[in-house]
Amino acid sequence: MQDELFETEKAPQKNTKNAKNAPKKSFEEHAHSLEQAIDRLNDSNLSLKDGMDLYKTAMQELFLAQKLLENAYLEYEKLQTPDKKA
């Protein structure tokens, strides 16, 4: 099950318009954006195009949140492992 949590797929393509200038989001911010996208995707009045755009955005948020979670787990594991160089 643990492997499933950290299994990542190929990263969705990023929107490069503002990616260089945008500050990095926290895990919580990505999770919140994902929740908002899911809420909007449940809107029955959402057009197909808007739904697809929103889905792509949600997948990007999910991927970035997973990467942050994976990095945090790896850092945790590193802290739990005694330094073998000493």
From Swiss-Prot:
Any one Pfam family match given in the protein's UniProt record, by short name: Exonuc_VII_S
Keywords on record: Cytoplasm, Exonuclease, Hydrolase, Nuclease
Function: Bidirectionally degrades single-stranded DNA into large acid-insoluble oligonucleotides, which are then degraded further into small acid-soluble oligonucleotides.
UniProt enzyme class: hydrolase
One cellular component term from this protein's GO annotations in UniProt: cytoplasm
The keyword tRNA-binding appears for this protein: no
Annotated spans, Disordered: 1-26
Protein name in UniProt: Exodeoxyribonuclease 7 small subunit
Similarity annotation: Belongs to the XseB family.
Assembly behavior: Heterooligomer composed of large and small subunits.
Catalytic activity: Exonucleolytic cleavage in either 5'- to 3'- or 3'- to 5'-direction to yield nucleoside 5'-phosphates
Subcellular location: Cytoplasm
Main localization of the protein described in the UniProt heading: cytoplasm
GO biological process, one term: DNA catabolic process
NCBIfam families from the UniProt entry: PRK14065.1, xseB
Keyword Cytoplasm: yes
GO molecular function (one): exodeoxyribonuclease VII activity
Gene transcribed to yield this protein: xseB
Domain of life the protein comes from: Bacteria
InterPro entries: Exonuc_VII_S (IPR003761), Exonuc_VII_ssu_sf (IPR037004)
Enzyme Commission no: 3.1.11.6
Organism, scientific name: Helicobacter pylori (strain Shi470)
